[in-house]
């Protein structure tokens, strides 16, 4: 705890880039939430652009009030 679930359009990330992303996010979570490294998990799911509406409908729009960073777009 915490678990971070990143969804994005497909990116060409190799394992080294994924590890660097995870390390950077982990450092931020440790600094701001006072978490232990061993408590943090991070998922990276690459979603095709034509499938993004489903993510918006299920995960973004219903939680708009809870988002600490709101998107600059709407669907």
Swiss-Prot record:
GO terms for molecular function: intramolecular oxidoreductase activity, interconverting keto- and enol-groups. This is Tautomerase PptA. Homodimer. Its EC number is 5.3.2.-. It is found in: Cytoplasm. Belongs to the 4-oxalocrotonate tautomerase family. PptA subfamily. It comes from Escherichia coli O139:H28 (strain E24377A / ETEC). It is an enzyme of class 5 (isomerase). The gene is pptA. GO terms for cellular component: cytoplasm. InterPro entries: 4-OT-like_dom, Tautomerase/MIF_sf, Tautomerase_PptA. The keyword Cytoplasm applies. The active site is at 2 (proton acceptor). Keywords: Cytoplasm, Isomerase.
